[in-house]
Amino acid sequence: MAIISSRDTGQNAEGPKRRQQKSSAWRKEVRELSFAGERGADPSALLQPQAHPGEAQEESLRPRTLAEYIGQTELKEVLSIAIAAARARQEPLDHLLFYGPPGLGKTTVAAVLAAEMGSQFYMTTAPALESPRDIAGYLVRLKRGDVLFIDEIHRLPKVTEELLYPAMEDFRLDITIGKGRSARITSLPLERFTLIGATTRIGALTSPLRDRFGHVQRLRFYEPHELVQIVLRTARLLNVSTDPEGAAEIARRSRGTPRIANRLFKRVRDYAQVRGDGHISQEVAAAALELFQVDPMGLDWIDRKLLTVLVEQFGGGPVGLETMAAVTGEDPQTIEEVYEPYLLQIGYLQRTPRGRVVTPAALRHLGYEAQSPLPLWS
């Protein structure tokens, strides 16, 4: 198959004041530690689930088949049935829409589906499809069974989206020729193809577009044992000696996200090479991740800043999103799409009709006294 593409460790015994005092020393040490290939990388971006420059091109780490794909068991079962049925009928797959937080493998699943079907895989993003001619350029060259993958599909311009409706439903491309009263529509037949869309904001899709997908599937956060398998697989592919305990230490701090797990693994690998003998043990992994202020629950200094501001300035909440963004200096969309999903997942933050509220579990993790059940992944 061809692919064509357009702060502090957060120890529970420490309070917020002590963690703040360690910040400058941490930043100095991170700057001085030269990591192979990524000198000057921003350590605060380690836990952001969005792809960093160059990461999306690392095809060697991507699974090629459903059998190689780790995790998402229910999704794989649904897709294996769809693939078998399409093969039996000798038909292309129905259109598919994948949604969920970033970094969970939506692009990878799309590429795996194309490989399983023996199809050509065309990949683009909605922001790159600014005008109808952009999407038309893809549609007219698709052959029967080819897969067109559109990432961030919720960001499609309206005129481009409307061009997709007849293409998805009737496999035709409606082109308007001329302007004003002399304008006319010419329809071009298209080969039967499969459109796969990916989005982190399924609620932002219009109903007409969403309803044209035959499969709408959600990708969930990964369990720690699944991330351990992913880390060990990456270690084998990169030929890095790694203990299962070292892989587990990385996995439990990876926020349920494979992209973050692989990113943290590479930083731990660099640390082991510079500060040790190249072998990743539990002790080496913990020391490396503590250097980057990724604590045992997978929180970094920005996560802790968000929670601490809610506690110290607003008594734990409730606080509206815009207010929280103004006080912390973070973009509201970044808070909502990057940081909140994981904090909600582990039970450290709650959304209420009146705003965001810090939970007792988060208070205890930050070093404040609180009586509550243990967090979900403790």
Curated annotation (Swiss-Prot):
It is found in: Cytoplasm. Residues 13-222 are annotated as: Large ATPase domain (RuvB-L). SMART domains: AAA. It holds the Pfam family RuvB_N. The keyword Mitochondrion does not apply. Residues 1-12 have a biased composition (Polar residues). GO terms for molecular function: ATP binding; ATP hydrolysis activity; four-way junction DNA binding; four-way junction helicase activity. Has 3 domains, the large (RuvB-L) and small ATPase (RuvB-S) domains and the C-terminal head (RuvB-H) domain. The head domain binds DNA, while the ATPase domains jointly bind ATP, ADP or are empty depending on the state of the subunit in the translocation cycle. During a single DNA translocation step the structure of each domain remains the same, but their relative positions change. The RuvA-RuvB-RuvC complex processes Holliday junction (HJ) DNA during genetic recombination and DNA repair, while the RuvA-RuvB complex plays an important role in the rescue of blocked DNA replication forks via replication fork reversal (RFR). RuvA specifically binds to HJ cruciform DNA, conferring on it an open structure. The RuvB hexamer acts as an ATP-dependent pump, pulling dsDNA into and through the RuvAB complex. RuvB forms 2 homohexamers on either side of HJ DNA bound by 1 or 2 RuvA tetramers; 4 subunits per hexamer contact DNA at a time. Belongs to the RuvB family. This is Holliday junction branch migration complex subunit RuvB. The gene is ruvB.
